[in-house]
Amino acid sequence: MEILSKSDDEIYELAKPIWDNLVKSSNLKDYGGFTRDFSTQMLFGANEVELGKQWANNKLITNLKETFEPFGCLRRGDHITVLIKQTNKEIPGEFLGRLVLGVEDNMVKVFGATIY
């Protein structure tokens, strides 16, 4: 699958179910669900114990609202970074979500995901 030539709106359509799953799985502290769409490279860095520690100590990543707004794409090399406006159920304000997508084995996979 070729994603680099897709429009921002087409990328948003690809990113929405992936980010949706990350939000739901993070709120549930579900490691298997959270890592479902990860690339092989991301899986090596996604230690279940470390993720568990983050979930235990961080209200931001366990109380995310399931509504979000993608607002931009950055293309670099073989990856596209989707910028997402995210809100939280307990912490006021808006947060920046970053979802890095690429292709592995002809499937769109997560090569990076953060929220600030």
Residue ranges of model-derived segments:
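Surface-exposed, charged secondary-structure patches
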Residues: G52-L101, G112-Y116
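Short, low-complexity N-terminal intrinsically disordered segments enriched in polar/charged residues
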Residues: M1-L28
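A common structural junction motif
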Residues: V103-N106
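Short, charge-rich amphipathic alpha-helical segments embedded
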Residues: L43-W55
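Short, well-ordered alpha-helical segments enriched in acidic and aromatic residues
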Residues: N27-Q41
